[in-house]
Structures are given as structure tokens and as C-alpha cells.
Amino acid sequence: MAREFSLDKTRNIGIMAHIDAGKTTTTERILYYTGRIHKIGETHEGASQMDWMEQEQERGITITSAATTAQWKGYRVNIIDTPGHVDFTVEVERSLRVLDGAVAVLDAQSGVEPQTETVWRQATTYGVPRIVFVNKMDKTGADFLYSVSTLRDRLQANAHAIQLPIGAEDQFEGIIDLVDNVAYFYEDDLGTRSDAQEIPAEYKDKAEELRNSLIEAVAELDEELMEKYLEGEEITIPELKAAIRKGTLNVEFYPVLVGSAFKNKGVQLVLDAVLDYLPAPTDVAAIKGILPDSNEEVVRESTDDAPFSALAFKVMTDPYVGKLTFFRVYSGTLASGSYVKNSSKNKRERVGRILQMHANSREEISTVYAGDIAAAVGLKDTSTGDTLCDEKDTVILESMEFPEPVIDVAIEPKSKADQDKMGIALAKLAEEDPTFRTQTNPETGQTIISGMGELHLDIIVDRMKREFKVEANVGAPQVAYRETFRSGAKVEGKFVRQSGGRGQFGHVWIEFEPNEEGAGFEFENAIVGGVVPREYIPAIQAGLEDSLENGVLAGFPLIDIKAKLFDGSYHDVDSNEMAFKIAASMALKNAVSKCNPVLLEPMMKVEVVIPEEYMGDIMGDITSRRGRVEGMEARGNAQVVRAMVPLSEMFGYATSLRSNTQGRGTFTMHMDHYEEVPKSISEEIIKKNKGE
């Protein structure tokens, strides 16, 4: 099967937004116009095409990024739908990693919202070019130019309108295209639009003013254009388009479009802008990887002739075909039935079938080419972030980084039958989502699940029930505390057991010191003269690493410390790896009295958006939760309070905020850093954990 669309006619895009900015509806409409859907599904009725998991349809939010293929004007557009809720930012990161460009959807009434900022930051980190679609222009209070100004004020983005709405709220009836200098009117809510017309007289001045500031903004990024502009020469439409494209691809400029996806206005123009301004796989820098043997950096060009390389960016369990692995092909081609190398795990994998996904239906294809996004059936060992490549020409592409979970919940199966099923279900869910972890507490035997927030874990439990038919009782959420040392000391660990016959002997001297925040555990071997033989060093390091997991104060993992092994002794007959492993863990226990261990708790960066009149109550509430208010600003007619609050104090905050603001307040939070727990509180936690 030959390539259907050339590389320069391929677009891999994501649609990113705040909750409720209308992202799923926008995606829906795109699929509708590109001929993939026959009846439009409304998110309000819970029947949207992209939101195909049952919980998404019930909650009306998008959780998993389904990858869909569509066609528009002879181009292939692969769309990755990304979730807008902060508990799912890993999904967003994971999809941004494999896209080439994105459409950021804003709500015309609120402009840039807290989650938009988070997602925007992530897109900037990955250098993703963006166009912006100001949606919901038909909504009461919609204000296009205000929304454009929020992009500049809150995100410091060089964003300029390339369209202007004709009318607003229920009078929104058309769109002026500032690039082509024409107007389109919509004749009904089904998106039937007039041919290009002249700009209405009452909009001429505004349109000209905005067009001039657009030309000025892109001319600043292009010297040739700047000269023409300064000399007062006419800048042609193709020149203007080329300059907007160049600025957008360099992530220096963001064109802003307008419309109402719900009322089918402006979506076709968004599709045109995707083709005009967002990159093809050949426009973005070729992906870099490293050779597994030599760690040498190599570049994989985005062509069909290059060796095959791809990144698995999502693993899902499908009710019909089992495990589905979504992957993005960066170079080369892959035929179904062939073998590939998973270079991240050094395993050989067979690709059974290759499917091209439409939100919830699929089409089997025989070959995928560079730049394509597809799903493979039959990969056994591949998980999110792994590289798949040619067996003869291996490479490891840079993987994705996932944040550590911050919240733990104990979970118990309701019956014996559920017990066995629960293990399988949790393993499959953890395979799909790298920010979800599951472990068994060795002392209590309880199963603990950890995730990014309460909603994240709610949905996991919900999926166990629905997809795996596992009934479980869920405990109260627990905070993932950590421990660390505040001072250093030299400590001895000695393990001797002589009881006739062969004994055990391990003896070490280790210097412990606090490490920088976030630097993790560092082990240094400073033994000279072989006082501890070389073969026992790994056992000493392993002994320390195992003991770190259970901490020294209250059983929480010990982080950010340095350990330097500088002395010790051994016995010719009695020493073995096990003895040194135990000696190392004894040294760590002995460090408790000398190294001033403290308890750390996750601090959340919280942003609360509330109407002015509730300001006093909310500030008081944050302070009562041991929070520090770090700033506030007016945003439209609302107030935004930014604060740092310990996660342990944020449980149930959603409910309390609702009751404090009559349901008008919203908040977002994400983990920022770890901070020492105040002494009185840490004593309580230690007591509770030691069961006193």
C-alpha cells in the first residue's frame, strides 16, 4: 500500500484547553467537517465521539487522549484529544511529546484560565507551535479582544488576531478574515456560510487597525518584510501568510481565530489555519536519540527511507483486541506482522496488526509511514515512553518524564473473587498510566494506589468497577510524605553473627549528608586499600536503597541524601553480600539520632478563582489550612488568589470552596515542591504511623 498523503500534507495536532472551554465539541466539529462523523455528538448530552470511555461521557470531561485521523482539502490531519483537567496533565504532556503543533481553545468569556496556563507552559517546554481558537463566541459575556489580551498579559505570548467576530453573544453572525481581508456570514447554526464578502462598513476601521498591528507584529520577525513595511510598500496576502507561518513554526508568534464550535461557526477556518500555519513532520527539527551501545547522539530524519523509529505514547486495554499501543512514527516505515526492537527495554516485539483509530471505530492498515500516528496490537512488553525501532539499526529516543504521584489511597477488594481480579486490573491500569502506581504495604498487607489527585484516583477505582468488574472499598486519601536529613554525620553499621559453623560478618562506616532538593539519593564509594572488597560495594548500595524506601522516622521514603562509604572491615570466611547489605541498613538506622531527620510534605501550588465578594472568606480559609497567600490579581470580574498549601490540608477543598462561594468558585492545584512539616504536626504523624 503506497503512501496516501505526502509528508508535507500531514499534520499531527493536539487540541488543548481548560476544562469546559469547548475542546471536545471543537474536535467533534472538526471530525464532522472532515467527513468522519455522520451525526454530531453533543458533550452536553454525553454522546461525544472522542470521549469514548464511559466515565468521560458521564462526567463530560476528556480523560484519555484518543488519536483520530481525519482528512481536509487533500491533507491528513491526525488529532490527539488531550484532557483539560489538572489531574490528567500527564496525558497532556504525553500527547504534546508526539504532536507537531496544537490548537489552544479558549473560552471567549474568560480568556486564559489557570489550566490553560499549565498546558501552555508544557507546550512551551516541548517547543510546540500553536494557533489559538477563541471559542464560545455565542456565550453571554463573550469578548474576543479581551481574550486576545489575556494571552499577552497572562502568558506573555506574542498573540495577534487574524480574525475578527461580527457581532457577539446571540448576535454573533460572522467572521472577518484579516489576512484575506474579507468577511463570511453564517446563515444558520449548521455552519452554512456565505461566500467571501466585503467587510461591513461599521467594521472597516477596526479591521484595518487590527490588520495593521498584525502586519507590524509579523514584520518584526522577518527582516525583508520589515523593510517593505517601513518603506510603505503593500504586503501581499501570500507574503503575510508566509510570515505568519514562519513566526508560528518558530514558536515566536500565535495567530488567534474566533468562532463557536457549538453553533458550527468558524471551525472550517480553524482547519484551514491548521494547514496554513501548523507544521508538517518535516518542518519540525528531526528527532534526536542515542545509540544504546555507545550513548552517542544521533538524528533520525523524518523520511520513509530512514531506519524505522517510533515512540509509544499511550497504552490502552481495549475490550475487543486486548492491549493497544499508540505510537508515533518518527522515521522509516513499518508493516504489520513484522518484528521490531523495543530499545528502551532491549526486547524483541512482534507487531500483529496496525490500526488507524477513529475516536471509537478503527480501520486496519498494512503499513505506517514516517509522521503517522497509529495503534499496534500484539506488543507485549512495551509501555508508555518506550522507543520502538528497526532491529538492525537501534536507537533510543528521548523518553518522557512523568511527575511523581502525590496522593495515596488504601483499597480493599470486597470479596475473595475480587481479590484476584483486582491485582490484574491494577497492573493493567498502571501499565496505561505512568503517574498511577500500585504497591502493597509490607506491614499491613494493604494495597495502596497512588496518583496525581483525588479525581485521578476516583476515576481509576471507577474504571476497575466498570471495565474489570472489581468491587472495592476505598480508604481515606493519605499524603505521600517523605523524609530527609537536615545534618550530616559519620555512622557505623556492624552485623556479626557467630553461632558455630559459618557466621555472618559485615562492617561499614558511612558518612551521610543532606543532598540538594530534588537531587535524590547519591552513593559514593570512597574505600581505599580494599578494606571492603569491591564485590560487596553493590550490596552495600542496595542495602541502603532498600532501607531508604521505609525511611527512619515514620516509614516514609527517605529522599535527597548523600551517602559516602569510606571505611569498614570484612572477614575472609564469614563475609558475604547479605551481611554487608544488613550492615548498611543498620548504619542508616543508626543515623537517626545523629542526622536530624525531618518529615517533608508535598506543597501544592493552588490557584482559586472567585467572585470579589468571597475574597475575605477564601483568604481566611487558606490561612486556616496552613497556606501562604503568594499573590492575587483581578481577572475580568473575578479575583484570583495564588497560594502554597500543604496537600494534607487540601482534601475535600472542592466541597468547602463550593459551599463558601455558592458554587461560583473554582480552583486548580499541582504539586510544587516538598517542605518540612511543622514539629507539632510531624510528631502526630510519627506517632500515628508507629501505631502508638
Curated annotation (Swiss-Prot):
The keyword Nucleotide-binding applies. The keyword NADP does not apply. It is found in: Cytoplasm. Residues 8-282 form the tr-type G domain. Its main location: cytoplasm. Keywords: Cytoplasm, Elongation factor, GTP-binding, Nucleotide-binding, Protein biosynthesis. One of its GO terms (cellular component) is cytoplasm. GTP binds at residues 17-24, 81-85, 135-138. One of its GO terms (molecular function) is translation elongation factor activity. NCBIfam families: EF-G (TIGR00484), PRK12740.1-3 (NF009379), PRK12740.1-5 (NF009381), small_GTP (TIGR00231). Catalyzes the GTP-dependent ribosomal translocation step during translation elongation. During this step, the ribosome changes from the pre-translocational (PRE) to the post-translocational (POST) state as the newly formed A-site-bound peptidyl-tRNA and P-site-bound deacylated tRNA move to the P and E sites, respectively. Catalyzes the coordinated movement of the two tRNA molecules, the mRNA and conformational changes in the ribosome. This is Elongation factor G. It comes from Bacillus pumilus (strain SAFR-032). The lineage of its organism: Bacteria, Bacillati, Bacillota, Bacilli, Bacillales. The gene is fusA.
